[in-house]
Amino acid sequence: MKNLWIDLETTGLDPTKHGVIQIAGAIDIDNKVVEEFDFKVKPLPGDGVTRKALDINQVSIDELKDRPEPYSVKQEFLKILNNHIDPYDKKDKLFMLGYNSKFDYDFLRKWFEKQNYTYFGSFIWFPPIDIMNLVAFQSREGRTEFKNFKLGTVAQQYGIELQEENLHDAHYDITLTRELYKRVKRRGLNGSISKATEPSPL
């Protein structure tokens, strides 16, 4: 089993209008992490940048301009993917996992398309696997205990000690998501969570 754990930071909520500014994650094969990556990247020409996104990511327009060019990041990222699958074999693809993963899937696909690369589907199985939905299913008996379903809130509910200053960094968020998945898996989908667990570090 080949899994791509991935999280993106973006300049807004619309993959058509807005851009990608960080791509981070890990590839695991048969439950063993074989590669990790963390790319900071400049928005593509024409990508809109919202003030809210800048505030969330604690970054300025000038700092974004100093980041690596999208083309070079795209080439490095494709090299990583090609190291672990054969894009010419329709049965050899990566399962994409994340928290609210359809958001990241849509942005990543559009990011490639904006750079005239249309073979995204050669690498990734559709649909992506959303850890948020697994948590929602498992926690339905204790749903009223969750004040919201943001990653940080849910992680705390599962007893994960947060480094709140690192939330909205793609590398930290996907690390958090992987730990959350481990805890969901230990309980089993028919398990339940009705109250917050004592926090423990990642």
Show where each model-derived region lies:
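Metal-dependent phosphoesterase core characteristic of DEDDh/y 3'-5' exonuclease domains
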Residues: 2, 17-21, 27-59, 81, ...
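Short, hydrophobic/glycine-enriched beta-strand segments
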Residues: 3-7
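Metal-dependent phosphoesterase signature
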Residues: 57-84
